[in-house]
């Protein structure tokens, strides 16, 4: 890997044994190296990358670690909303994919993508989507974004054919866009835990 994967990226490993520190027994039965794991937030004194494994059931989620040199492929949330990929998906008729296609019609000033079950389905073509699936959206925001533009995003999201939630990723963590615009502050999820802040683009002193 030429760059370090970021939270929400999907990564593939070179071997099943590359997945470290997994305690849940179902992982050995359901996961194989042909399936991706998702990068999560955590810190490690061995410089490993924190990942999560998705099981067949909604409640089946397991946390583990991987060494960067064992990652052979990385798909970012932004890659999953390329129009050609969305239109060519076997799930193109599902509401979350239709919603993502609708969002691509507007020239947003930021990079964005999809995560969660929709992202997993688009990346793997595994049928984990259904008619009632939500759409999890991610906006990359290395710098503060214009509030009015973000309100326009939320207005368009509210018109989508499925329920959708937006997380905004800053250099210091991620927060729920709706919460921040409504309350003026939000819970910022960082690698060291969550903290309530009105300034998610500033490092905590």
UniProtKB/Swiss-Prot annotation:
Question: Which reaction equation describes what this protein catalyses?
Answer: apo-[malonate decarboxylase ACP] + 2'-(5''-triphospho-alpha-D-ribosyl)-3'-dephospho-CoA = holo-[malonate decarboxylase ACP] + diphosphate
Please list the residues that make up the active site: 134, 136
Q: Which gene encodes it?
A: mdcG
Q: In its keyword annotation, does this UniProt entry include Cell wall biogenesis/degradation?
A: no
* Record EC number: 2.7.7.66
Record protein name field: Phosphoribosyl-dephospho-CoA transferase
What EC class does the entry list?
transferase
The alphabetical list of record keywords is:
Nucleotidyltransferase, Transferase
Q: What role does this protein play?
A: Transfers 2'-(5-triphosphoribosyl)-3'-dephosphocoenzyme-A to the apo-[acyl-carrier-protein] of the malonate decarboxylase to yield holo-[acyl-carrier-protein].
Care to name a GO molecular-function term for this sequence?
nucleotidyltransferase activity
State the family it belongs to: Belongs to the MdcG family.
Tell me the organism.
Klebsiella pneumoniae (strain 342)
């Amino acid at each position: 890997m030429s760059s370090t994967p970021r939270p929400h990226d999907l990564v593939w490993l070179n071997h099943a044994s590359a997945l470290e520190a997994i305690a849940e027994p179902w992982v050995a039965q359901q996961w194989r190296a042909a399936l991706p794991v998702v990068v999560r937030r955590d810190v490690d004194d061995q410089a490993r990358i924190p990942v999560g494994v998705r099981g067949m059931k909604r409640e089946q989620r397991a946390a583990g670690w991987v060494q960067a040199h064992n990652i052979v492929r990385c798909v970012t949330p932004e890659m999953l909303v390329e129009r050609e990929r969305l239109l060519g998906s076997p799930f193109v008729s599902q509401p979350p994919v239709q919603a993502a296609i609708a969002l691509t019609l507007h020239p947003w000033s930021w990079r964005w993508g999809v995560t969660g079950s929709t992202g997993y389905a688009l990346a793997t073509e595994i049928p984990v989507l259904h008619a009632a699936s939500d759409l999890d959206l991610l906006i990359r925001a290395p710098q503060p974004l214009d509030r009015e533009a973000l309100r326009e995003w939320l207005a368009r999201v509210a018109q989508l054919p499925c329920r959708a939630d937006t997380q905004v990723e800053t250099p210091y963590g991620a927060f729920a866009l709706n919460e921040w615009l409504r309350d003026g502050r939000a819970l910022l999820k960082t690698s060291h835990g969550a903290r309530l802040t009105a300034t998610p683009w500033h490092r905590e002193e």
